[in-house]
């Protein structure tokens, strides 16, 4: 039986190698921790249908390799992404320091309107923390990002990170800030009736006015 959904969103999971991107994806899709996680080679893919604000949304999620040698390959997957999880490891300042470069790639190669949530992963390793919550919050605020600390091991805030990103995209569609019909938006309608309901006013038929004669 074919899946039915109102919208399809293309998501990216980006950030340096070793930050737990694949484990976040696995926790979100399978609801369990990926014990034998190796570095991603190129890209990995997962999908899940979720309910967000009364709408059924299919998330197509591309988990990209963090190593520099794969950047030319993974960058080709950025195009047409509606949302992204930008991931760093709270126990590794090096992964935090590279966030600006990853964010530039996302906004340049995907879309200037891409919705990004910053995820400080490995929250379960708090005693080994190298990046404070306050510092990361400041980075998120300066770059107009949402922010959560997550744990792929315990599952803390993993679901919320994906859903918060999807919820923001839906709100932007409702407000007219994002147009699903625009090429490269990373958004597709799953139900044809929704497309008709959300046609721009200029495209809808104008009711005839009485002539007054």
Swiss-Prot record:
The protein's enzyme class: hydrolase
Positions bound to GTP: 18-23, 37, 39-40, 66, 121-122, 124, 152-153
Covalently lipidated residues, kind S-geranylgeranyl cysteine: 211, 213
Motif (Switch 1): 39-44
GO cellular component term of the entry, any: secretory granule membrane
Positions bearing Cysteine methyl ester: 213
UniProt motif (Switch 2) ranges: 65-74
Main subcellular location: membrane
InterPro entries: P-loop_NTPase, Rab4, Rab_GTPases_membrane_traffic, Small_GTP-bd, Small_GTPase
Modified positions (N-acetylalanine) in chain numbering: 2
Catalytic activity: GTP + H2O = GDP + phosphate + H(+)
Residues annotated as binding Mg(2+): 22, 40, 63
Alphabetical keyword list: Acetylation, Cell membrane, Endosome, GTP-binding, Hydrolase, Lipoprotein, Magnesium, Membrane, Metal-binding, Methylation, Nucleotide-binding, Phosphoprotein, Prenylation, Protein transport, Transport
GO biological process, one term: endosomal vesicle fusion
Function: The small GTPases Rab are key regulators of intracellular membrane trafficking, from the formation of transport vesicles to their fusion with membranes. Rabs cycle between an inactive GDP-bound form and an active GTP-bound form that is able to recruit to membranes different set of downstream effectors directly responsible for vesicle formation, movement, tethering and fusion. RAB4B mediates endosomal tethering and fusion through the interaction with RUFY1 and RAB14. Acts as a regulator of platelet alpha-granule release during activation and aggregation of platelets.
Subunit field text: Interacts (GTP-bound form) with RUFY1; the interaction allows endosomal tethering and fusion.
Annotated protein name in UniProt: Ras-related protein Rab-4B
Species the sequence originates in: Homo sapiens (Human)
């Amino acid at each position: 039986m074919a899946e039915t959904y109102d919208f399809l969103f293309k998501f990216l999971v980006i950030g340096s190698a070793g930050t737990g991107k694949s484990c976040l994806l696995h926790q979100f899709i399978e609801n369990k921790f990926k014990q034998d996680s190796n570095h991603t080679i190129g890209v990995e893919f997962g999908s899940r249908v979720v309910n967000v604000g009364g709408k059924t949304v299919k998330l197509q999620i591309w988990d990209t390799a963090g190593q520099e040698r794969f950047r030319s390959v993974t960058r080709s997957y950025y195009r047409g992404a509606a949302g992204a999880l930008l991931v760093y490891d709270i126990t590794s300042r090096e992964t935090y320091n590279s966030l600006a470069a990853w964010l530039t790639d996302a906004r340049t190669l995907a879309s200037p309107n891409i919705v990004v949530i910053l995820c400080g992963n490995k929250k379960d390793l708090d005693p080994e923390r190298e990046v404070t919550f306050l510092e990361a919050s400041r980075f998120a605020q300066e770059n107009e990002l949402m922010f959560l600390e997550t744990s792929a091991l315990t599952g803390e805030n993993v679901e919320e990170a994906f859903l918060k990103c999807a919820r923001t995209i839906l709100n932007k569609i409702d407000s007219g800030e994002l147009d699903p019909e625009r090429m490269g938006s990373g958004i597709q309608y799953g139900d044809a009736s929704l497309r008709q309901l959300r046609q721009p006013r200029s495209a809808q038929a104008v009711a005839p006015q009485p002539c007054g004669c």
